[in-house]
Amino acid sequence: DRVAITVLGPDIQESLNISDTMLLGLGSFGGVVLVLSTIPFAWLADRYRRVGVLSIATGVWAGLVAFTGAVQNAFQLAIGRAGTGIGAGAKIPISPSLIADQYPIAIRARIFAAEALGRPIGQVIGPFIAGGIVLIAGDGPDDWRVAFYLFSIPALILVVAIFLLKEPVRGAYEQDAVLGGKLEKAQEEPPVRLSSAFQRLKNVRSFYYLVVGIGVLGFALVAVPTTVSLLLEEYYDYGAFKRGWLISISWAAALIAIPFAGKLGDKLFRQDPKKALWLMGLLVALYGVFVTIGVRFTNIVLLMVFYTLGNACQGAAFTQMGPTISAVVPYRMRAQAFSLVGVYIFLMGGFFGGLLTGAFSDAYGERTALTIVVPPAALIGGVLIMYGSRFMKRD
């Protein structure tokens, strides 16, 4: 649904008669609600069957995606985005926790990279499908609604598939590595309280600088896709379908970069763990460089080439996040740790970054807004992550 909001943003804006600031603010608002919901979902994940919690949340998300297609004003759109944020909030703390418990330590970077491929695959296929649905529906002012109705159907199928997954043993591979076997259930400790977990996580310096760096990056990360879509509509007069396939193409290089980064990350982690985190920081900074260069070109081919390179760097960078957090955070606090990533991305950076970018966009245009917001967010975020890599071995 986030891809649909990105591609169909100009159509939604025209249909509901809202400004760039309002559109980006509502998108960011969904991120804020998502963030706030990650913390209770992390609490639930530590106490109940994680696949069950995730399947229920996915069902809520599917229902609110369909509701988004029926909204008639900005207030209703805010409710829809908030609801999808709640539903999607479960994925941030629960999915990485399940992956870390399901697969051995030595191959986690590759597994997280394989999981991360879902995003660029969705970014490649989703915009094309969203734009195509609107085109087939008639390309009218309200035909964007059809896309949201149809996108809720596969989400409902996913609910059943998730519920049927087997729940992995928590920390099994860490127990095996340290103790030579799994702990008996009677010996297991109770779940760590959220307040205690957050206090302990603040002392894991590599994790602290990682999430702060991601939070700074969030000022650009959340607002860029929708702003680029608005740029394509405003400056180039592209309709939903053309915007869709251009945004699809912009994620094609990430399909190559992500598996390569996952394999390279495993290799670097075995050599020296801090090198893998340093790689993430470098790729975050390069994302900012490529996107900024790209939006300064008026030639659409050059713009999309550099934007595509930026997306490839962004996708590759996040392959190192899951393995890093899994390595430095005790397995009983993984869900809480991953929930904090969402807090920093959307609450610290995403919400305010969306409002800031929208305000600059309304005042000076999308191209100038991106030029102002992206460079400091990506460069400072990348440097913070690289600085945090020095604490990897200690942590």
Segments and roles (model prediction):
Residues 28-42, 248-261:
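Central cavity-lining transmembrane alpha-helices of secondary-active solute carriers
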Residues 169-211:
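Juxtamembrane intracellular "pre-TM" segments in multi-pass secondary transporters
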Residues 80-120:
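Cytoplasmic helix-loop-helix junction between adjacent transmembrane helices
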Residues 17, 49, 70-76, 87, ...:
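Helix-breaking motifs and short loop linkers at transmembrane-helix boundaries and internal kinks
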Residues 52-66, 275-291:
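Structural signature of the two symmetry-related core transmembrane helices
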Residues 115-170:
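Helix-loop-helix hairpin linking two adjacent transmembrane segments in secondary transporters
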Residues 5-6, 204-259, 318, 322, ...:
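Extracytoplasmic gate region of multi-pass secondary transporters
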Residues 36-75:
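Conserved MFS/SLC helix-loop-helix module at the cytosolic interface between two early adjacent transmembrane helices
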